[in-house]
A protein has these predicted regions:
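Inner-leaflet juxtamembrane helices
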Residues: 1, 67-88
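Interfacial loop at the N-terminal end of multi-pass membrane proteins
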Residues: 1-33, 86-97
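Individual transmembrane alpha-helices with interfacial aromatic-anchor signatures
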Residues: 25-28, 95-114
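Lipid-exposed faces of alpha-helical membrane segments in multi-pass integral membrane proteins
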Residues: 30-37, 41, 61-64, 68, ...
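Membrane-helix exit/interface motif
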Residues: 32-49, 75-78
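Interfacial segments of alpha-helical transmembrane regions
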Residues: 48-67
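Juxtamembrane boundary at the C-terminal end of a transmembrane helix
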Residues: 120-131
Length: 131
């Protein structure tokens, strides 16, 4: 990154994340609550009506991947976001932001994308679009 932009980012990121943080946290918690709850509901509903479908297991796999988003990287993400809001380390917020972006990229490909694929395959399977 251009040093001029780095200096600006180090100044602007902490207040931006302080303002965005609570709203963004609500969005993330809400979306993962919906993913986990709907995945579990679809798994349990199929069981209650006696359907033994492959889709049920895809729903559970999606739930597991969605839960991994929070369980594996949740504390690290919260710590990095706190560092960004606090201007750490030593006013070099872009260092913390870079770490958060790298962690987020890894998490997106390791668990978020597989969760999304599992939920899509589950839905298509239950609708008999695929076997």
């Amino acid at each position: 990154m251009d040093p001029t932009y780095t200096a600006q980012a180090n100044t602007l990121l902490p207040p931006w994340f302080k303002n965005w943080g609570p709203w963004g946290t609500n969005i993330v918690v809400g979306s993962f609550t919906i993913s986990l709850a709907s995945g579990m509901a679809n798994f349990l509903t199929g069981r209650e009506i006696g359907e033994v479908t492959v889709g049920r297991y895809w729903y559970m796999a999606g739930v597991a991947f969605a839960a991994a988003h929070l369980l594996i990287w949740g504390q690290k993400a919260l710590g990095l976001l706190a560092m960004i809001r606090g201007g750490e380390p030593s006013g070099e917020t872009t260092v913390s932001m870079g770490r958060w972006l790298e962690m987020h990229r890894l998490r997106s490909f390791a668990v978020d994308l597989p969760a999304m694929v599992c939920f899509i395959v589950a839905a298509l399977s239950v609708m008999d679009v695929i076997v």
